[in-house]
Regions:
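Cleavable N-terminal signal peptides
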Residues: 10, 19-20
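Residue-level hotspots at or immediately adjacent to binding/recognition sites across diverse folds
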Residues: 21-341
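N-terminal signal peptide c-region/cleavage motif recognized by signal peptidases
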Residues: 15-17
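Bacterial N-terminal signal peptides that target proteins for export
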Residues: 1-8
Length: 341
């Protein structure tokens, strides 16, 4: 059953969240990313398709690269050198990229050019994911409870503090601190919050997974959250819904969990690996690939019930992937790869 904090404990910290307005641009001036001939061979942390004819990948040094086929790449102009961890496109024109230094970038031309919406290096926290419900309503999440929301397409971003993700004993501690020192309360709230690693918008339901076995869902786009059954103490890094409407969540030490009841009960398929699993890729024909550290690639042909190991010979981490024009194209620690299957 979902784990829900008692009304009394939640009320101590406003049962939904504490929200404060944040400045979008830091007083620190960022340096623009440098054009690098081998950017497609450097550390890349995410890759996505923009429509049916374009790929975009992001990674270290603010690199954003684009391709029409997964083989030939060119680099976009980017106004930061911060490592970028995630790229998301709402449609073929509107996109966002997030990363270190609490950076949020926005593109209105399909990724050709980018502008800064948020840059706060003094926070010393990275964003790990971003998703938009409409062209105006979006959420970005990251390390130690980092959670920002926009309702105007990113012209302004508001920071939120969510008490649902903090244990009851720590909620009591925070409630006492809040009465004494507001600034100390906000700092402590962040330090006690888990890392938020990945968001998935599944129809009207928004899922969030992260540190300490966090699996949570929201039916109002992240205003209120319900914690699902605690099935694992380690971190989760991705969650998807399969073509047969099952939930899959993956994380540390080769852990995979599968639910046929939208998270109310779970089974644990055997993966025969202890590698950290970074990403889940679905193909058009229903196959599932899990991308992991140490060159580990897992394939399932039965909707995630069992897996076959297909380890890559170079042993390099497979970090993010996309099924594009019948090929598995992966962002890795050594750049973009088209993985032979």
């Amino acid at each position: 059953m979902p784990f829900i904090f008692s009304f009394m404990m939640s009320a101590l910290l406003y049962s939904v969240s504490y929200v404060c307005l944040a400045e979008n641009i830091s007083s620190i001036t960022p340096y623009s990313s440098i054009k690098a001939p081998l950017a497609n061979q450097s550390l890349l942390l995410d890759i996505t398709a923009v429509g049916h004819h374009k790929l975009i990948a992001v990674g270290q040094y603010g690199h954003i690269i684009m391709s029409a086929d997964g083989e030939s790449w060119h680099q976009s102009n980017v106004p930061v050198q911060s490592t970028l961890t995630k790229v998301y496109f709402y449609n073929e024109n509107l996109g966002w990229a997030v990363g270190h230094d609490a950076t949020i970038l926005h593109s209105q031309d399909g990724g050709v050019s980018w502008a800064i919406q948020l840059f706060k290096p003094r926070l010393e926290k990275p964003f790990f994911d971003i998703v938009f419900k409409t062209p105006l309503e979006g959420i970005a999440v990251g390390a130690k409870g980092l959670f920002y929301r926009t309702i105007d397409g990113g012209a302004t971003w508001n920071k939120e503090y969510h008490s649902e993700f903090i244990s009851p004993e720590n909620l009591l501690h925070l409630s006492k601190l809040k009465r004494k020192d507001e600034d100390a309360f906000l700092d402590e709230h962040s330090s006690l919050s888990p890392h938020f690693n990945h968001l998935m918008l599944d129809g009207r339901t928004l899922y969030l997974v992260g540190e300490h076995g966090l699996i949570s869902k929201s039916n109002d786009f992240g205003i209120n959250w319900t914690l699902l059954e605690h099935i694992y103490k380690g971190s989760f890094y991705d969650i998807i819904r399969t073509l047969k409407s099952k939930l899959l969540v993956v994380g540390l030490h080769g852990h995979v969990f599968r639910s046929s009841k939208s998270g109310t009960s779970w089974t644990k398929p055997d993966t025969n690996t202890v590698a950290l699993i970074n990403d889940i890729v679905l193909t058009d024909d229903g196959r599932i690939f899990l991308l992991a550290a140490d060159g580990v690639l897992l394939e399932s042909n039965d909707d995630g019930q069992s897996y076959r190991l297909k380890k890559q010979t170079d042993g390099k981490a497979l970090i993010s992937g996309i099924w594009f024009n019948g090929q598995l194209i992966v962002a890795s620690e050594t750049g973009v790869k088209i993985v032979p299957l």
